[in-house]
């Protein structure tokens, strides 16, 4: 009964009734046995299959992770080897370039030294030729000048002595 929104309980649902408790328990046990016979096996096997599937997925994930770590380790090793190889190639290239540069510089220096030596030798030869020409001209001028001064003819030995003396005087004055 309902009076002003409150339920009056006179031997209703909340009072314990031993017969109701007995039959409820018996019904529960019977339903439990039926469920155990019919549904428990499939439920347990489904749960076990699910557990096996999950465990299999976990195992595959661990295996994939281990394989990925192994591949990563190998890649790092390969990268380290490639870095070392590239460093070696760069170092060898630099050494080769340095040797090549040094060889070219050495060859250029040798070529320049050879050219300078040849130029000096050529200059020295030209200097000797010019001095020889100059000596001859000076000797001739000196002889002509001496002949005019003394108005007499000199013999060849005397001319040679006078010319040699003048050349030596000129050489000592120049140096």
Curated annotation (Swiss-Prot):
Localization (cell): Cell inner membrane
SUPFAM superfamilies: F1F0 ATP synthase subunit B, membrane domain
Primary site of residence: membrane
InterPro entries recorded: ATP_synth_B-like_membr_sf, ATP_synth_b/b'su_bac/chlpt, ATP_synth_F0_bsu_bac, ATP_synthase_B_chain
Source organism superkingdom: Bacteria
Transmembrane regions listed in the UniProt entry: 14-34
Cellular compartments per GO CC: plasma membrane; proton-transporting ATP synthase complex
Membrane topology field: Single-pass membrane protein
Gene3D superfamilies: F1F0 ATP synthase subunit B, membrane domain (1.20.5.620)
Disulfide bonding pattern of the chain: none
One of the Pfam families matching this protein, by short name: ATP-synt_B
Single Gene Ontology MF annotation: proton-transporting ATPase activity, rotational mechanism
Keywords tagged on the record: ATP synthesis, Cell inner membrane, Cell membrane, CF(0), Hydrogen ion transport, Ion transport, Membrane, Transmembrane, Transmembrane helix, Transport
Keyword Flavoprotein: no
Family (UniProt): Belongs to the ATPase B chain family.
Subunit structure: F-type ATPases have 2 components, F(1) - the catalytic core - and F(0) - the membrane proton channel. F(1) has five subunits: alpha(3), beta(3), gamma(1), delta(1), epsilon(1). F(0) has four main subunits: a(1), b(2) and c(10-14). The alpha and beta chains form an alternating ring which encloses part of the gamma chain. F(1) is attached to F(0) by a central stalk formed by the gamma and epsilon chains, while a peripheral stalk is formed by the delta and b chains.
Protein purpose: F(1)F(0) ATP synthase produces ATP from ADP in the presence of a proton or sodium gradient. F-type ATPases consist of two structural domains, F(1) containing the extramembraneous catalytic core and F(0) containing the membrane proton channel, linked together by a central stalk and a peripheral stalk. During catalysis, ATP synthesis in the catalytic domain of F(1) is coupled via a rotary mechanism of the central stalk subunits to proton translocation. Component of the F(0) channel, it forms part of the peripheral stalk, linking F(1) to F(0).
Protein name stated in the entry: ATP synthase subunit b
């Amino acid at each position: 009964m309902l009076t002003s929104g409150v339920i009056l309980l006179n031997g209703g649902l909340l009072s314990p009734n031993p017969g109701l408790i007995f039959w409820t328990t018996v019904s529960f046990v019977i339903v439990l046995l039926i469920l155990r016979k019919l549904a428990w096996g499939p439920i347990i096997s489904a749960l076990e299959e699910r557990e096996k599937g999950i465990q299999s997925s976990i195992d595959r994930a661990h295996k994939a992770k281990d394989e990925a770590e192994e591949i990563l380790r190998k890649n790092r090793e390969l990268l380290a080897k490639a870095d070392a190889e590239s460093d070696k190639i760069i170092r060898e290239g630099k050494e080769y370039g340095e040797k090549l540069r040094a060889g070219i510089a050495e060859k250029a220096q040798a070529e320049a030294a050879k050219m300078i030596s040849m130029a000096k030798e050529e200059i020295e030869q030209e200097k000797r030729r010019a001095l020889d020409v100059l000596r001859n001209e000076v000797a001739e001028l000196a002889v002509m000048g001496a002949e005019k001064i003394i108005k007499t003819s000199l013999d060849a030995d005397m001319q040679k002595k006078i010319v040699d003396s003048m050349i030596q005087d000129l050489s000592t004055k120049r140096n």
